[in-house]
Amino acid sequence: MQIRFLFLLCLLLLGAACKKNDTPVTPQPTFGKEVQVTKTAEPAVPLPAAPLFSQPLATTIIEATNEALPIWRSFAKNRPALIIAANTPAMLAVPAELRTEVDALLNNADDKELTKRSSPNNPDPLLLPIMSLSAALDAGWFSQVLWIFPSKNLPEQLELATFQQQLIAAGIATPDEATSFTLSQGNFSGIIRGRPFTAAPAATLPPLEQSALLHIDADYFKPLYSGEIKTPIYPLMVDFLNKLKAQNWKIAAATVVLSNQQFDALPLQTRFLGKDLAAVLQNPQMLKDSFPRQWERRANALYLENFMQKEEIHKLYLEMEKIDPRDPDVKFGLYNISRQRNQPDHALVYLKSAVQIDPAYALEYLALAQLASEKNLPEKAVVMLQFARAALPENPFILTQTVHTLLTNNQQEEAKALKPKLATLKWSKIYYPEQVGAQEAILKLLEGK
């Protein structure tokens, strides 16, 4: 599908980010200065902000980037800068045929409707999470953008021509926008959607005079993490946060994406990462002090996985559970280690406990359903899918997968029982054309046609 193809291209990008301009019509990139670029003639309202990590920061944990839209919109009158640290900057352009509707959604819908119509679990969305920042720029919410992209390369290894080509291929920039970019001191700088846009690795972050919002996607660490031996996750996180702190940027609020329910999602084992990032933003003293003992135990458990120390890992997670019985990440850790210890019944009990506290962990049932199908155990696959549906009833993909599995298992009556629910799904012909045809075929099959 074209949208998914473009998104995969997005993941190849190295960066883009933040500039200044005094002219609303044709802004010129002026590195790091405060800008007044607005969609309307209304002046921006000054935004109260404090240097990052100088005090607790209002931080919202979200599942997918689209959930940041209502928060960003609440600051739109201030026209702040946006600093986004992510593997991909959610800058895929909104399809031309939907831009009028998307503009109306962003400007007129209430927060609930805005989130719903952009959700990754909506079969008929107006925009996808990977379009969130693109849509926000179209709406004029931000004056400039700084994208902090993950990179293991040295600044001198970055290539402008390659970056420009990738911007165009990924649908992030038009050819004219791409040619506006320059490369200096490890920063790509240009104009996208009429806004100064800069991309930089954490090693060469630019100054920024203007107050900003901060958006961190846990997937930022995906290309940087190579296991606990080479790149232990907590030191990696601390190094990144210290680089942000050194800039002394004025930040008004932050959003942190867990990124387990977006396209190209992070594995559920990483779900703790976004929560811990948010904890440090909310309590900056943690960056100076030793991290909580629970985090040390988790780090040790992750490290010991490299040496198959199942009993020691199990012991660590049991200690963590005793300290915080309501931590779903610990329950999920116990689920994983119980599977490794060949205790499937215990594992399912821990998984159920994790799901009861944090329903997103029900996505693991999909992996178990796939495993059961591969082992030619369709009945168990159906049971796992039913568990997933019970915890995540609004996820249309689970429903369609359940019906497909039932039909594959010749459970016609059980599949027909889901037909009314399946028939209510309206799939987007733009984003999910293959689902439109598949659903029509399944409904005809269930009707006996």
Locate predicted features.
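TPR alpha-solenoid repeat register
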Residues: V330, E364, I398, Y431-Y432
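TPR/TPR-like (Sel1-like) alpha-helical repeat modules
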Residues: F387-L392, V403-I430
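Catalytic cores of soluble, metal-dependent hydrolases
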Residues: F31-I62, A68-N78, P129-M131, F142, ...
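Bacterial signal peptide processing site
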Residues: K19-N21
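C-terminal motif of bacterial Sec signal peptides marking the signal peptidase cleavage site
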Residues: L14-A17
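TPR/TPR-like alpha-solenoid repeats
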Residues: I337, L371, T405, L422-L425, ...
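Alpha-helical positions within canonical tetratricopeptide repeat
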Residues: E312, H346, K380, E413-A417
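Active-site histidine-anchored catalytic micro-motif
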Residues: P56-E156, L160
